[in-house]
C-alpha cells in the first residue's frame, strides 16, 4: 500500500498532462488558447494547419502542471493529421460558436470521431478518464445568438462535461474555464486516472434531458406533448401529466426545465381549447 509520505512526495512532483482542442473551424479554439496562454486576442482569423502544439506551465492546488496543448484544426481536410493525437489525453476543450447552430450540432460528430480513433472499447457516453470542458464561445458577438445558454448547458451537463460561456475577444470566462478545467484534471490524476464520482453526478436523468430537447425542437403543440394530431382530451391530459411530473422545476434541476415546463403548460392549454 502506498504510504501517506509517498503520496505527499508525489503531489510535489510537476504533473504532465495532455490537452486537445476540438470543434469546427472558425469557432475560436486557437483564440481561446492564445487568450489564456499569451493574454492576447488575435482579431484576424488564421486557420490552424493540421496541429498547433504548445507547452505552458500553470500552478493549480499548489501543484506545478506542465500542460502539452494540441490545438487541432477543425476542417475535415485535416482529419488524417489530427487522428493521431486523440490517444493518451487527459483533457478536451470542446468549442462551438453560439452564433453558429451547426457548430453546436457538430459536437456529437467530434465525440464520435474521437471514439472511432480511441477504439471500440471506449464508451463515449462514459469517458470517466478524460475531463471535458465545453466552451460556448463568442458570447460578445453582435450577431444573433442561435444557441442559448440552457441548451448548451443541458447538452454538456447531461454528459458530465464542464460548461462555460466564453469570449476569446474580451477574455470573459476564459480564466475561470481553464482554472476549473485544470483543477478537474488534477483531481482525475490524483484519483488514479478517473474522475471522482462527485464530479460525474449530474443531478438529472437522461429522460429529463431528452424530453427538454424534444420540447425545444418540437414543431407544434401536438409534437410538444408527444401525442398525435386529433388526440382526445384524456390523451392530452395524460401526456401533460407525465411531462409535468418529469419536468416540474421543483423536482427537475436540468438546464432549461423551467422553460420546458412552461411550454408544456401552454401546449396543453392551446390543445384543449380546440378539443370538445
Swiss-Prot record:
J domain mapped to chain residues: 220-276
Annotated disulfide bonds: none
Signal peptide per UniProt: none
GO biological process terms, semicolon-separated: phagosome-lysosome fusion; vesicle-mediated transport
One term of GO molecular function: GTP binding
Family annotation (CDD domains): DnaJ, RJL
Entry's localization field: Nucleus
InterPro entries (alphabetical): DnaJ_domain, J_dom_sf, P-loop_NTPase, Small_GTP-bd, Small_GTPase
GO CC aspect terms: late endosome; lysosome; nucleus; phagocytic vesicle
Superkingdom in the source lineage: Eukaryota
Positions bound to GTP: 23-30, 71-75, 137-140
Keywords of the record: GTP-binding, Nucleotide-binding, Nucleus
Role played: GTPase possibly involved in regulation of the MEK/ERK pathway.
NCBIfam families to which the protein is assigned, alphabetical: small_GTP
Assigned protein family: Belongs to the small GTPase superfamily. Rab family.
Name under which the protein is recorded: DnaJ homolog subfamily C member 27-B
Natural source organism: Xenopus laevis
Highest classification ranks of the organism: Eukaryota, Metazoa, Chordata, Craniata, Vertebrata
Gene: dnajc27-b
Amino acid at each position: 500500500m502506498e504510504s501517506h509520505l509517498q503520496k505527499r512526495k508525489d503531489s510535489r512532483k510537476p504533473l504532465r498532462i495532455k490537452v486537445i482542442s476540438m470543434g469546427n473551424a472558425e469557432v475560436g479554439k486557437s483564440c481561446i488558447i492564445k487568450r489564456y496562454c499569451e493574454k492576447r486576442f488575435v482579431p484576424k482569423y488564421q486557420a490552424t494547419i493540421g496541429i498547433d502544439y504548445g507547452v505552458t506551465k500553470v500552478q493549480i492546488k499548489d501543484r506545478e502542471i506542465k500542460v502539452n496543448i494540441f490545438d487541432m484544426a477543425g476542417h475535415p481536410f485535416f482529419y488524417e493529421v489530427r487522428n493521431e493525437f486523440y490517444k493518451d489525453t487527459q483533457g478536451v476543450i470542446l468549442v462551438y460558436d453560439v452564433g453558429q447552430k451547426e457548430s453546436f450540432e457538430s459536437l456529437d460528430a467530434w465525440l464520435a470521431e474521437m471514439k472511432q480513433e480511441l477504439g471500440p472499447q471506449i464508451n463515449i457516453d462514459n469517458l470517466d478518464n478524460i475531463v471535458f470542458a465545453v466552451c460556448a464561445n463568442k458570447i460578445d458577438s453582435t450577431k444573433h445568438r442561435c444557441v442559448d445558454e440552457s441548451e448548451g448547458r443541458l447538452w454538456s451537463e447531461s454528459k458530465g462535461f464542464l460548461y462555460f460561456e466564453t469570449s476569446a475577444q474580451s477574455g470573459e470566462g476564459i480564466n475561470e474555464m481553464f482554472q476549473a478545467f485544470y483543477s478537474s484534471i488534477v483531481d482525475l490524476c490524483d484519483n488514479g486516472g478517473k474522475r471522482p464520482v462527485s464530479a460525474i453526478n449530474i443531478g438529472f436523468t437522461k429522460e429529463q434531458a431528452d424530453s427538454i430537447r424534444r420540447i425545444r425542437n418540437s414543431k407544434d403543440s401536438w409534437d410538444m406533448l408527444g401525442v398525435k394530431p386529433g388526440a382526445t382530451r384524456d390523451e392530452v391530459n395524460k401526456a401533460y401529466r407525465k411531462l409535468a411530473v418529469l419536468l416540474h422545476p421543483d423536482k427537475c434541476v436540468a438546464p432549461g426545465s423551467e422553460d420546458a415546463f412552461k411550454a408544456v403548460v401552454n401546449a396543453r392549454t392551446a390543445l384543449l381549447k380546440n378539443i370538445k
